[in-house]
């Protein structure tokens, strides 16, 4: 019998604590929750572990402030960083969170040199590229959670529009995890039926736009923070696909090297996820308009990467 997987979650805020909890509930492995705030991850982890007898989950959960306790992790999920506040775009967080991601990634690479890193911190695509650059890991072992969350939001809005089960809906959202993401109605179906057969074009466009600003809608409603239930579950879906070698196709932020005409930039594309992380980028046949939108989205990410390079974060 193989040993249980070790999952480290960096950052014990709302997203991080829920990633840890959902990993434990699904018994994906033993979980280490780490944060710079003294005693806080220990308290949250203890509370979670005290819940395990009630549902009979066989996962150990520990909290720590010491990266030595994260050594030899199979997967490291990085959620640490400042969340968005009302009126902020994800890009406004660039310099604040770059310092955090650089420091965290250096520790991750030191203690878990064979791990797969999943980045959740915004601005997502740029932070994922920074983590890849700092870690020195191969590109398949550093990826970002983005498109599967955006696709889940698109699916939720379609289900609300049609009054059908979300289980019936498949959707694909590509591009950077920002306001210029690229939902693809052409690749979106309800029980195999294209949504273009079920929803008028103007309503599809409204749902696409709501998906683009879906995170901001929640920030505006909450007023004191950003979304965490859906981002956490979207992340855990990726963790599960990798640890169980499920070979699932999910849109995530991966390093493009020529795919879709995008070079040297992390961007949301359909990825085959398995034990090696991103095992393949799937190239869809996009229309000219879809491809232009995807490349424009990647261009915005490139602008953020250029700033990080100028500031000395990316070598």
Swiss-Prot record:
Substrate binds at residues 84, 90, 122, 153. The keyword Oxidoreductase applies. Belongs to the LDH/MDH superfamily. MDH type 3 family. The gene is mdh. It comes from Thermosulfidibacter takaii (strain DSM 17441 / JCM 13301 / NBRC 103674 / ABI70S6). Catalyzes the reversible oxidation of malate to oxaloacetate. This is Malate dehydrogenase. The active site is at residue 177. It catalyses: (S)-malate + NAD(+) = oxaloacetate + NADH + H(+). Transmembrane segments: none annotated. Its EC number is 1.1.1.37.
């Amino acid at each position: 019998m193989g040993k249980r997987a070790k999952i480290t979650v960096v950052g014990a805020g709302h997203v991080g604590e829920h990633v840890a909890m959902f990993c434990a509930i699904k018994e994906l492995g033993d979980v280490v929750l780490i944060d710079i705030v003294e005693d806080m991850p220990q308290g949250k982890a203890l509370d979670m572990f005290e819940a395990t007898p009630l549902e009979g989950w066989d996962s150990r959960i520990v909290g720590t402030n010491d990266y030595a306790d994260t050594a030899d992790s199979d997967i490291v999920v990085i959620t640490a960083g400042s969340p968005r506040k009302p009126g902020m775009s994800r890009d406004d967080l660039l310099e604040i969170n770059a310092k955090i991601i650089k420091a965290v990634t250096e520790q991750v690479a030191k203690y878990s040199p064979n791990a797969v890193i999943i980045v959740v911190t915004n601005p997502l695509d740029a932070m994922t590229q920074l983590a890849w650059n700092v870690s020195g890991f191969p590109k398949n072992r550093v990826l970002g959670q983005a498109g599967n969350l955006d696709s889940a939001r698109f699916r939720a809005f379609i289900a609300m529009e049609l009054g059908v089960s979300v289980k019936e809906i498949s959707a694909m959202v590509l591009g950077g995890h920002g306001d210029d993401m690229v939902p693809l109605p052409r690749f979106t179906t309800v029980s195999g039926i294209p949504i273009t057969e079920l929803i008028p074009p103007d309503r599809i466009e409204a749902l696409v736009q709501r998906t683009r600003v879906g995170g901001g809608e929640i920030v505006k409603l909450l007023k004191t923070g950003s979304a965490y239930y859906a981002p956490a579950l979207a992340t855990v879906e990726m963790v599960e696909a990798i640890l169980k070698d499920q070979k699932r196709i999910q849109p995530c932020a991966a390093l493009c090297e020529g795919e879709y005409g995008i070079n040297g930039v992390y961007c949301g594309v359909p990825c085959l996820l398995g034990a090696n992380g991103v095992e393949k980028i799937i190239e869809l046949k996009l229309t000219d308009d879809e491809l232009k939108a995807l490349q424009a989205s990647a261009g915005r990410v490139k602008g953020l990467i250029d700033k990080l390079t100028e500031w000395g974060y990316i070598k």
